Amino acid sequence: MTEAAEATLSADIQLIQRIIPHRYPFLLVDRVRDIVPNKSAVGIKCVTMNEPQFTGHFPGLPIFPGVQIIEAMAQTSAVLVGVSMDLADKGAKVYFMGIDGAKFRRKVVPGDVLEMTVTVKRGGGKVWKFEGRASVDGELAAEAEFSAMLDLPKG
């Protein structure tokens, strides 16, 4: 692990955008804190009524889609990989490969602050496996295990 990775305990939106390619409307993590390289991190998503998915999910009853909670956990994991391997500005991509055991436990609505805790189960090479738990005010909203593949640019 590089000295820069060891010194980074959090990632603001500028660093997140230097690590992962996602942008509005599909950038689903605002900040990542408590980064322990190669081990764990906590992503933060502030859910607002301005989210574009609320126009159809559901009119008059805005509920943040469960699949986007899983995607937010995956993006948090990609930032963890990027910090762990010092990948900012290097054009690396972390591709979501699979998901197991996804469960949704509570609605996430505008005004909620979603915290995604991700833990590395296996990693350090091209394929990583994670366990993720998303919560609001300490109450479990969703959980899943998922895997991702690291794609480094050639050359």
From Swiss-Prot:
Annotated CDD domains: FabZ
Keyword annotations from UniProtKB, A to Z: Cytoplasm, Lipid A biosynthesis, Lipid biosynthesis, Lipid metabolism, Lyase
Residues of the active site: 57
Reactions catalysed, as given in the entry: a (3R)-hydroxyacyl-[ACP] = a (2E)-enoyl-[ACP] + H2O
Enzyme class: lyase
Summary of the function given for this chain in its UniProt record: Involved in unsaturated fatty acids biosynthesis. Catalyzes the dehydration of short chain beta-hydroxyacyl-ACPs and long chain saturated and unsaturated beta-hydroxyacyl-ACPs.
Family: Belongs to the thioester dehydratase family. FabZ subfamily.
Protein's name according to its UniProt entry: 3-hydroxyacyl-[acyl-carrier-protein] dehydratase FabZ
Organism for this UniProt entry: Cereibacter sphaeroides (strain ATCC 17023 / DSM 158 / JCM 6121 / CCUG 31486 / LMG 2827 / NBRC 12203 / NCIMB 8253 / ATH 2.4.1.) (Rhodobacter sphaeroides)
Gene that encodes the chain: fabZ
